[in-house]
Amino acid sequence: MISVKGLWKVFGSDAEKVIGSPLADLTRPELRAQTGNTIAVRDVSFDVAPGEVFVVMGLSGSGKSTLVRCMTRLIEPTAGSLTFEGEDILQVNTARLRELRKTRFSMVFQHFGLLPHRNVIDNIAYSLEINGVKKAERHARANEVIELVGCRDFQTPIPNSFQVACSSA
């Protein structure tokens, strides 16, 4: 179970002073003009049950990426609580956080990057490689994914060619 309760991310100095004060009720431009701060995530709460598919949707600039980055602690929330399978994610140490990111958390970045010195198969199989999966298995699994998304003809070109060719697939 993932549980997010009262999660806030305020960018700027003295961000904590915004939460629970009349400043939190200001519009974005008003808050920015008065304090220099920006509220990116405002008092978000939800639970995701095991096996449940949960989608974060919203307009551009509404805080979706910031919310997910807070959930994975790529950026630190300003306030709130975040638990995963009963564990307080905001209290885990760096080693535990790294392990959770490696084995339990994932996100697809809005502007992802390919490793230009690797071919398409090796880019796709990279996460398997850093998790210690042998090369033959990595490539077999990467080929399954390539077949699944209909990009079999783009397995070996340089990544930029793959990105352009498969973006319309």
Question: How would you name each of these model-derived features?
Answer:
Residues G20-E30, E85-D88, E129-G132, A136-F154:
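Conserved ABC ATPase "signature" region
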Residues L31-T38, L90-S106, I130, K135-H139:
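ABC ATPase NBD coupling module
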Residues M57-L59:
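The feature captures the beta-strand-to-loop junction immediately N-terminal to the Walker
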Residues T72:
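Helix-to-loop junction immediately C-terminal to a conserved catalytic motif
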Residues H117-A125, I158:
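Short coil-to-helix segment of the ABC ATPase nucleotide-binding domain corresponding to the Q-loop/switch region
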Residues I158-C166:
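Conserved ABC ATPase signature
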